[in-house]
From Swiss-Prot:
Descriptive protein name: Acetate kinase
Lineage: Bacteria, Bacillati, Bacillota, Clostridia, Halanaerobiales
Reactions this protein catalyses: acetate + ATP = acetyl phosphate + ADP
CDD domains: ASKHA_NBD_AcK_PK
Species whose genome carries this gene: Halothermothrix orenii (strain H 168 / OCM 544 / DSM 9562)
Family: Belongs to the acetokinase family.
Residues that, per the record, bind ATP: K14, H208, L209, G210, N211, G212, D283, S284, R285, G331, I332, G333, E334, N335
Note on how the cofactor is bound: Mg(2+). Can also accept Mn(2+).
């Protein structure tokens, strides 16, 4: 079975084609600058052959058609014809309360995704565009929606209801949803395999640390709490997002800086986090370099970032009544050696012992705790596309 996985953004389109027999990637690539000047497609096949196609890509329709054509290209392609694709799996950011698992796309499902799009206005409309274009260009080929929020729908009510007037939840669906669900699910399952124990017997804390960052408490394979909330703004300090703050700061800033609500929202989402505190960059590597050079604001930004991660690990250990493993994943989690060391070294109260030699690796699946560490620590590169492909294959086969 061959599955095409698509992640449609506002001006970009990422894709991977999987052969599910051995779960291998046949081809992958990205369409960049859709609807903008100097648009292009970057493509690589399983033979390691790469190509860049620079052409006018005015919309997603042209972008997806270009992907289909490139997958069938005589030199760089891996398919003889489009009919070899058995199904298409789409990343959809927000499923609200309507979707607790991945689902086969129908007209009714599209309508329901539209209904929750106000909860993810920067993502869902573009995800829907990808779905509609595929329906038009690939009629008859089944499509599956895989939601970032679905994995967290197992959270208990006490974890997802905010202490606001309850009618806001009833009328508007204001509650904690959580994100990065496919990533948290994948690395938790991998951790269980590396421990050679059933996932159902484990308490795992997964730390997805990238430009967007979240932590999840996973008890017996189910998400019981997560740091992101109604939107991806809550929780950890991120590249440009503030994470947890006192809500009263918002009207205070509006008054002091003479800003309207959209301007404050822009500050919290795009001008805060590592970037806002350091004044340098949203990229943790740049901030770390500046900190080493003696930049105090960069040092403060990193201290806050690490402190918030440790705070959530401690909280989620309490939520689950213990923890068997902590997993680091995503760009920072997989590659920031000193960041991991600093976080893990202060988890001694959990019986954690760091293996510094093992930790001295980037982007590699590895246990970084010692053999006698009571709580295991892993670095596991995430693979959200594979989760989408697996879910798509499972749903289409059933």
């Amino acid at each position: 079975m061959k599955i095409l996985v698509l992640n449609s953004g506002s001006s970009s389109l990422k894709y991977q084609l999987f052969d599910m027999e051995k779960e291998t990637v046949m081809a992958k690539g990205v369409v960049q600058r859709i609807g903008i000047d100097n648009s292009f497609l970057e493509h690589e096949n399983y033979r390691g052959e790469e190509t860049t196609i620079e052409t006018d890509i005015p919309d997603h329709n042209r972008g997806i058609q270009l992907v289909i054509d490139t997958l069938q290209d005589e030199k760089y392609g891996v398919l003889n014809n489009m009919e070899e694709i058995d199904a298409v799996g789409h990343r959809v950011v927000h499923g609200g309360e309507k979707f607790a698992e991945s689902t086969l796309i129908t007209d009714e499902v599209i309508k329901q995704i539209e209904e929750v799009s106000e909860l993810a206005p920067l993502h869902n409309p573009h995800n829907l565009t990808g779905i509609r274009v595929c329906s038009k260009l690939m009629p008859g080929i089944p499509q599956v929606a895989v939601f970032d929020t679905a994995f967290h729908q197992t959270m208990p009510r006490k974890a997802y209801v905010y202490a606001l007037p309850y009618e806001y939840y009833e009328k508007y669906g204001i509650r904690r949803y959580g994100f990065h669900g496919t990533s948290h699910k994948y690395v938790a399952e991998r951790a269980a395999r590396l421990m050679d124990k059933p996932l159902e017997e484990l308490k795992i804390i997964t730390c997805h640390l990238g430009n967007g960052a979240s932590v999840a408490a996973i008890d017996a394979g189910k998400s019981v709490d997560t740091s992101m909330g109604l939107t991806p703004l809550e929780g950890l300090v991120m590249g440009t997002r503030c994470g947890d703050i006192d809500p009263a700061i918002i009207p205070f800033i509006m008054d002091k800086e003479n800003l309207d609500i959209k301007e404050v929202d822009n500050v919290l989402n795009k001008k805060s986090g590592l970037y806002g505190v350091s004044g340098i960059s949203n990229d943790s590597r740049d901030v770390e370099e500046a900190s080493k050079d003696g930049n105090e604001r960069a040092t403060i930004a990193l201290e806050i970032f690490k402190y918030r991660v440790k705070k959530y690990i401690g909280a989620y250990t309490a939520v689950m009544g213990g923890v068997d493993a902590v997993v680091f994943t995503a760009g920072i989690g997989e590659n920031a050696i000193e960041m991991r060391e600093s976080i893990v070294e202060e988890l001694g109260f959990l019986g954690v012992k760091l293996d510094r030699d093992a930790n001295n690796n980037r982007g590699k699946e590895i246990e970084i705790s010692t053999k006698d560490s009571r709580t295991k620590i892993f670095v596991i590169p995430t693979n959200e596309e594979l989760v989408i492909a697996r879910d798509t294959a499972r749903i289409v086969e059933s």
